């Protein structure tokens, strides 16, 4: 199979998470712009920094596809916007929830609620669409800022000031005054700092600057 290359850095990638219930209703749609992916060989392509936001037109396309094929359950779509044409392309759809699905919970929409209500409780819930912008990342802020442009950097800093930043590993309830709690805290802190070494080795800033360095402006995608 031959296909044209879709240009753009990590920020041109988008994630859409959906859930379709037994009545073929798309009860959940959430999405986020990927800012940076993991570049280590064993985890290549996994998003590690994202900003959640709604993409109404992509939601329409996703809903039409899922209902058209009679889907039931979770679906995770990977899109990439071509940096030259601005056209979003769907790369794949996975019949499962994504590894980074917690970005939906960070924005106030827990995917498990829709599954439990549909499959276990047998209830019909009101369809929801993600509409909050939050910053989700497992990396130190200043590391991510090295791989985005100034405008994207301003967005990240603004969300930090608004306390709309979330790290799925950062859960103080696990850090009680016990040996187990202290070990967990040490793991989280060491893991975060270890990313500096991983990116220097696998994706140095010099390599990032060899390609497209501007970050994707999603204004058109978020417009109703």
Model-derived segments and spans:
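Conserved protein kinase catalytic/activation segment
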Residues: 86-88
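Pre-DFG segment of protein kinase catalytic domains
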Residues: 90-92
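Short acidic alpha-helical/loop segments enriched in Asp/Glu that coordinate divalent cations
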Residues: 76-78, 103-104, 128
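Peripheral (often C-terminal) accessory segments that flank ATP-dependent C-N-forming ligase machineries
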Residues: 117-224
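A short glycine-rich, hydrophobically flanked beta-strand micro-motif that places a catalytic Asp/Glu
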Residues: 3-4, 72-84
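ATP-dependent carboxylate/phosphate-activation module, predominantly the ATP-grasp catalytic core
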Residues: 2-70, 94-119
